[in-house]
């Protein structure tokens, strides 16, 4: 979360991204350009942790954009297929903690269906707490006990949101195969998740997205 007072501001960067040797795929290059253009914001911010930041990445401005969602879906599904094959697992469903995972999971699920309708990949969303009415669900959507799932998240920092989703899924009887993230901030989150035995596959790292000149003081914050 992000704390901002009235003297602080965010300006979207509608500029051409600096050339960085990242992924070779043209789809990934286009997605990176959209992320930098739509989601990288600059200002003076105090994060909930108390850390100071002069920029943050609001990844939801990208994952909720139709063109970017198409790219996230195609790239994400490619990574799901490659990683599942390498690890010898069958994936039943894709999801994660709301809201960071929601658009991303659905985009990948749609891409999976378009690529292979017979794969029957489903999607779901993990609430931060169970509903207090109706069926009192914490996991909404297409998830069943005993399924093997891929957890997704738009940005990981400490990994807490992803770990919350993993805990909820495992408590509900699911098996987590691995984790796909859009942006790894490289601030310990990946290591925290992998310490629990779950591989993390990022589409972009902080360095991929912003280069090596982001500055030690700067952090990518989750809005």
Question: Where do the PLM segments sit?
Answer:
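PRPP-dependent phosphoribosyltransferase catalytic core
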Residues: 9, 14-34, 167-223
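Solvent-exposed alpha-helices and their adjacent loops that cap or buttress functional pockets
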Residues: 49, 116-117, 141-145, 168-172, ...
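Short, glycine/charge-rich flexible loops or terminal/linker lids adjacent to PRPP-binding catalytic cores
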Residues: 99, 104-150, 160-164, 216-217
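Short helix-loop-beta connector
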Residues: 86-91, 144-146
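Short glycine-rich phosphate-binding loop at a beta-alpha junction
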Residues: 88-98, 180
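Acidic, divalent-metal-coordinating active-site segment for phosphoryl/phosphodiester hydrolysis
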Residues: 155-166, 188
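Active-site-facing substrate-recognition patch
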Residues: 13-89
